[in-house]
Structures are given as C-alpha cells and as structure tokens.
Amino acid sequence: MQSLHGNCLIAYARHKYILTMVNGEYRYFNGGDLVFADASQIRVDKCVENFVLVSRDTLSLFLPMLKEEALNLHAHKKISSLLVHHCSRDIPVFQEVAQLSQNKNLRYAEMLRKRALIFALLSVFLEDEHFIPLLLNVLQPNMRTRVCTVINNNIAHEWTLARIASELLMSPSLLKKKLREEETSYSQLLTECRMQRALQLIVIHGFSIKRVAVSCGYHSVSYFIYVFRNYYGMTPTEYQERSAQGLPNRDSAASIVAQGNFYGTNRSAEGIRL
C-alpha cells in the first residue's frame, strides 16, 4: 500500500507481528499490542485485517473532541512516528472496524458506527503524552480547523477575536492575518459552527427553536432565526417541517454529519481502558 501523508494507521497484533517502516527498519510487536502510527512512515503490503487506515477527515473530527490544551502547538525536536499500547484483553471491535474500512459502499449507519469505533480505538492512546504531538504532526491542522475546534468546544460562549486568539496563544492581529490568508474570518467561522450545530440540534436531537438558540450562543431567538434564514434560506421551523416530510433541504443533516461536522452535546473525550 502506498504511504499516505495526513493519514494514520491503527494496527492490532493478535500474535507476534512485524511492521516495516519506510526507512527499512522492522518493528516487532507481541500479541495484544495496539499500534498508532503515521501512515506515511509505514509500509503495509499484507495482512490487511490487522490494520485500519484513519483518514485525515476522520482525524480532523477527533481533534475537536480533545481538551483545549491539545491545541497549543509546541515545537518538538523529535516526534515518534509510532506508539504502542499493550491491551490486557482482546479488542473484539477491531475486526469489525477493519471490515468496515475495506467496504467502499457503507450505509449511513455503518459510516457513523465505523467512525465511533475508530474514535474508541484512538482514545486508548489519550494518556500517552506523545499521542497528541504525533496526531498534530500528522494532521498539521490549518487555522480554520484550530479556530473551529476552539469554538465547538464551547459553542455557546460569547466568542471574540481576542478570546479565540488567547486560546490559540497568539495575538488577535496575527490570528486575523492567518484567517485572511485562508480567505475566511473568525466571525464567518463562528456563524458556520453555530449554524451547523443548530441544524444537528433541530433535526437530529429535536430541540425546540428557543433551546437551540440558547445552546448555540444566541440571546435573541428572533436574531437566531434571522441568521438561520440567511444561512440556510429558510427558517428553523420550515427546516423542521421539510425534514419531517422527507423533503430535500440545501444542506441535509446527514450530509453535514458525513462531511465532518457531527459533534455530540458532550464535549469531553474519555479514554476507554483495555
């Protein structure tokens, strides 16, 4: 398999297992070892049932679930390209994830299950101090992703350019400049994040319009409706009615989830123990 930059690989050794690095080095693992690695540094040419390739898009979804200190990108002279966690018992879901990963025509429910199971596997490494540096080194998130991560960690907060810049350990002027280089702004990203969350709360969770407005940081329901109508071309109530009738909307909830904007109401990410 060709090495892919921006992707990661999770391998599970049920028995003794060998991975070959792109530099020709061999890494040996014992049964029960779960491996997280930079896919661009690994050669995988057999035993596909032993690994799961995690795309950049999926990694970008996992990033906002981490605590905010994970966003502080410090320079690391040397970052390991591979981490190992020895599991004391078998991981029955790994085979399912591997099978789902080989299927190119997943149903919507299967897509969500695959993503959830991958997140569970990634969470095994959360207590490893080298995990976040490796994840960020592979992903190298742009400023848009980092700003959206801050916003989505507390969607209802009264965010300002200065506050977001403070969270990212930079000056407001520098943040504004970097966002301009990516042809966006903090206010545009704030609206995007809030509108995407609003859609999920309305269509998926069935929240009332007033509750959605408050949950997304709007003190005025009428202003929330105004922003929603400008963004989606219809009011929240009209969107609810069309969704209930199965009519197509400009941006369906399913497509927003599929494109990587699905966040639960609980923002914490607790690692599972194996």
From Swiss-Prot:
Keywords per UniProt: Activator, DNA-binding, Repressor, Transcription, Transcription regulation
Protein name per Swiss-Prot or TrEMBL: HTH-type transcriptional regulator GadX
Key word Repressor present: yes
Annotated source species: Shigella flexneri
Domain HTH araC/xylS-type: 145-242
The keyword Calcium is assigned to this record: no
UniProt-listed Pfam families: HTH_18 (PF12833)
MF terms (GO), sorted A to Z: DNA-binding transcription factor activity; transcription cis-regulatory region binding
Cellular compartments per GO CC: cytosol
SMART domains tied to this protein: HTH_ARAC
Subunit and interaction comment: Homodimer.
Role noted for this protein: Positively regulates the expression of about fifteen genes involved in acid resistance such as gadA, gadB and gadC. Depending on the conditions (growth phase and medium), can repress gadW.
Induction of the gene: Expression can be activated by RpoS and repressed by CRP, H-NS and GadW, depending on the conditions.
Gene giving rise to this polypeptide: gadX
Signal peptide: none
DNA-binding region per UniProt: 162-183, 209-232
